[in-house]
Design a protein with these regions (language model features):
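Mature extracellular/luminal domains of secreted and GPI-anchored eukaryotic proteins, especially small
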Residues: 30-165
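PEST-like, low-complexity acidic/proline-rich intrinsically disordered segments
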Residues: 1-8
Length: 165
């Protein structure tokens, strides 16, 4: 493919095999713009919008029925999870920036993200739930299961303040 130096190369990029990579960067940029560090966090409306964006980004990768996603959004993790549901929760954690390079859930990264991605009214309850549930992942070897069960623990600890994409 030869580029004419006077034409905009962006349309060629969008229709090229690298399009998925380009769209992934667009999604990442969009998520970063929703979490303004300099503004001191987000309000509840922005937080709910970011949950929707994370859900949309992860639900296309895993076959989890929308009914199940709606249940876990409000903290109902009382189900026998399949591998898709386990890895959906890991995908969300990855988008939230709380995984290590090895794909493990990091409690310290989660604490660091709390003031950035949560509205003020959810920050203290989230920190309390993280403190209570930090050991919940230790009983599991699979990284997807670790994230699912720490999320379940946090939901069970304080369902009134728990929200999940």
């Amino acid at each position: 493919m030869r580029l004419n130096k006077y034409k905009d190369p962006l349309p060629l990029l969008v229709h090229s095999p690298n399009c998925r990579r380009y769209r992934s960067w667009q999604l990442l940029l969009g998520l970063l713009l929703l979490w303004p560090e300099l503004c001191g966090g987000v309000n509840m409306q922005q937080f709910i919008q970011s949950l929707d964006m994370m859900r949309n980004g992860c639900m296309v990768k895993f076959k989890v029925p929308i009914e199940i996603l709606n249940r876990i959004r409000d903290g109902d993790f009382d189900m026998e999870p399949n591998q898709d549901l386990l890895c959906y929760t890991k995908c969300v954690a990855q988008l939230a920036g709380v995984l290590t390079k090895k794909g493990e859930f990091s409690v310290s990264k989660a604490f660091a993200q709390v003031p950035i991605i949560l509205p003020p009214e959810l920050q203290t309850p989230a920190k309390n739930a993280l403190t209570h549930c930090k050991e919940a992942q230790n009983a599991h070897k699979d990284t997807c299961a670790k994230v699912f069960y720490i999320s379940k623990c946090m939901a069970d600890f304080d369902r009134a303040h728990f929200k999940f994409p």
